[in-house]
């Protein structure tokens, strides 16, 4: 069920009209930065997006302009993930095609105020289907800060989460 839903939604995401997607991305940014969770955050973690995902460069640029400390994830084998300070001059491509920091200097998760969480499919309770590796579910299992995801309409579906799934606290979307 999850794999089929993931495949269906990924196909829809990759076939989005670029002009429409850009407008939605800007709208989602405006909704996100209006949230108290964003306004109150000093340290924000996000990710470096693939072309079919929400364009995180918009959030990155806005957060830096707003004087926020910005973190991005680095993944390791066995599902381990850390967040490190964003340094655009220190980014490398992984074997999976992800853009990640070269640095291994992890920021303690207790320092992170808000995590902008990626995903492929989301339900009304904030549960998500990611890409299947479980990095975020493991990281978020004992994270006490705020979490938010930016979601296109085609990503909203009903599904039953697994017991180990961790919901995001806020889902920002458009009609």
Where are these regions (language model features)?
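Active-site and channel-lining beta-strand-loop segments
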Residues: 119-122
């Amino acid at each position: 069920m999850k794999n089929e839903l993931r495949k269906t939604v990924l196909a829809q995401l990759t076939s989005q009209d670029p002009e429409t997607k850009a407008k939605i991305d800007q709208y989602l940014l405006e909704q996100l930065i209006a949230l108290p969770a964003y306004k109150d955050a000093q340290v924000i973690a996000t990710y470096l997006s693939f072309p079919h995902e929400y364009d995180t460069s918009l959030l990155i640029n806005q957060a830096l302009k707003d004087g926020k400390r910005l973190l991005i994830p680095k993944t390791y084998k066995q599902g381990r993930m850390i967040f490190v300070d964003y340094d655009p001059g220190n980014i490398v491509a992984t074997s999976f095609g992800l853009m990640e920091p070269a640095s291994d200097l992890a920021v303690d998760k207790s320092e992170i105020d808000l995590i902008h969480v990626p995903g492929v499919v989301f339900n009304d309770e904030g549960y998500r289907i990611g890409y299947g590796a479980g990095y975020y579910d493991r990281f978020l299992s004992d994270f006490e800060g705020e979490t938010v995801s930016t979601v296109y309409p085609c990503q909203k579906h009903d599904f039953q989460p697994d017991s180990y799934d961790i919901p995001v606290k806020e889902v920002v979307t458009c009609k």
